[in-house]
Amino acid sequence: MLSYLKQNLHSYFSSRVLIFTLATAAIIFACATFYVISLESKNFSTIIGFLLVDLAIFLILGVVLTQKFFTKNNNNDSSKLQNRIVIAFSLVAAIPTIIVSVFSVYFFNLSVQAWFDKKISTVLDQSVIVAESYIAEHKLQLKETALAVAEDLSDMYYDLIHNPALFTKTLNTEAEMRSLDEAIVLNKSTNTIVANSYLSFSLSFATIPAHLIKKADLGELVEVKSDPTKIRMLIKLKEYNDVYLLVGRLVDNKIIDHVDATNGAAAEYNSLKNEIDNIQIKFSIMFIFIALLLLFVAISFGVIFTAKIVKPIKKLVTATDNVKDGDLTVQVPENEVDKDEIGTLYVAFNRMIKQLSRQQRDLVIAQRAMAWSDVAKKVAHEIKNPLTPILLASERLLKKFSPEIKERVEFENYLKMIIRHTNDIKNIVSEFVLFARLPAPKFTKSELVYLVKHIVEARKLLNDHILYKFESNVEQFDFMCDATQINQVMINLLKNAEESIEGRESGKIEVTIDVKDDFISVIVTDNGKGFPPELIGKATESYVTTSSKGMGVGLAIVKRIVEEHCGILDIANREAEGAIIDIKFDLKELDLKAKRLEM
């Protein structure tokens, strides 16, 4: 029963229907969540419910997609064991995350409700009311005082207006008697101060807003808010046009600061209380992102952890595939695994591959010996061919011209034939000996740019009908090499290029040195006839040539020298005409080889 359930559950999880269903549900619930959040009257419980459903859907979808991805790539780099471990890590991360999310949101909601308890709100509101009542009481008292002073001044205004000194004295008496910090009588028509108490600040109608003056004209008692530390009241004197009384009383700075602090704290508290739903929503969204991040971290950790387990087996499988493809130089690193069963398997595998490599090397040596035997036979055959006309010519000389030399022209022709075929023999034997007995390179530090440039200049003097061009991206370069062999390589390549240009009117040969990172390239290009397509793949093999001169071992020698110098020889035809030969040396490998030979 359990196996049947597991099998069907696995097939259901792997089906596209489930993925499509989850993706559709994710889109629908995401849109619904956005709609609920955007409503003016937000229901926090509904929003949290939608967010938790979104989290659950996304986590399940992530697990299913991960399982689907690894199943799809099962035949490539992943293994079934790795897939199972990664899926297990995903489930272990997803299920607790959902549970923790639900409880975290619930407890966060309880904590927030405790912060904004009704008792705290009541205390803050009462504090604001007390502070505002204090200021209101001061304003009420000042209003009553302003009305009383205005009444007194209105009764005495006719007598006081003609005696400014008496007006000022009376105004000061009123201010002292009623505990006013300032008292000013203003005339709007003349825009002047008629009288003021001693402690009053200079003031004009320009500093009083026009709408307040209009209210005062209507008989209202108006508050003038020009200084936060002072309460001022403006009133028009009865029966006197354009005459106004302004009284003021200072409020203690500590009280003002306390009132401002109380109002500020209450405003901030109420603002935070109004924003609490948004804060809870943001917290929930942040928690969802953290949960998804944890899921991805769990998957990543599962991949890394599984790779550590499966990596040794994968290396062994890869090495086996390389051996199957014919690479007998592959070895698995024994020092990277523990001394367990896998370590024993590594040791046995390496020993087996070394034995196979040794046997193959012995076989190659035997085949090479047979090849050299064929070479010797071919060389002997090539030597015998020019010897036959030499022998015949010598016999003819002996029989026909031994008594005396009468026909001089014919005699010279025979001699030229002997010389020509003798030179052929000399060239054949020289090339064979050079190829068969090429000495090991003796590495010394040489200036490569100077070496190549002077070879090019020397060939230019010998072939003035060919346009030579030399370029280098460095002025000089110290190169570990056997200068004699490198010289031989360049001469061989340039001679081949010159021979391919023979018969052309505008021959051109370019030699380029390019140093880049840990590699240096020497490139030779020409506009000659190039290589025949059927021979370009085996141009560096022995006895492959398109020339009537020599045995075709020149490029074979070049290849051997280049490989001895940790280089790669690349031969190709140009798109337009001619050939391009690129020699790329690995400087790091070359330095290591030179150091090994010095030891």
Swiss-Prot record:
It comes from the Bacteria. Residues 307-361 form the HAMP domain. The lineage of its organism: Bacteria, Pseudomonadati, Pseudomonadota, Alphaproteobacteria, Rickettsiales. This is Putative sensor histidine kinase NtrY-like. Residues 378-589 form the Histidine kinase domain. Pfam families: HAMP, HATPase_c, HisKA, NtrY_N. It catalyses: ATP + protein L-histidine = ADP + protein N-phospho-L-histidine. Keywords: ATP-binding, Cell membrane, Kinase, Membrane, Nucleotide-binding, Phosphoprotein, Transferase, Transmembrane, Transmembrane helix, Two-component regulatory system. Its EC number is 2.7.13.3. InterPro entries: Bact_Sensor_His_Kinase, HAMP_dom, HATPase_C_sf, His_kinase_dom, HisK_dim/P_dom, HisK_dim/P_sf, NtrY-like_N, Sig_transdc_His_kin-like_C. The modification Phosphohistidine is found at H381.
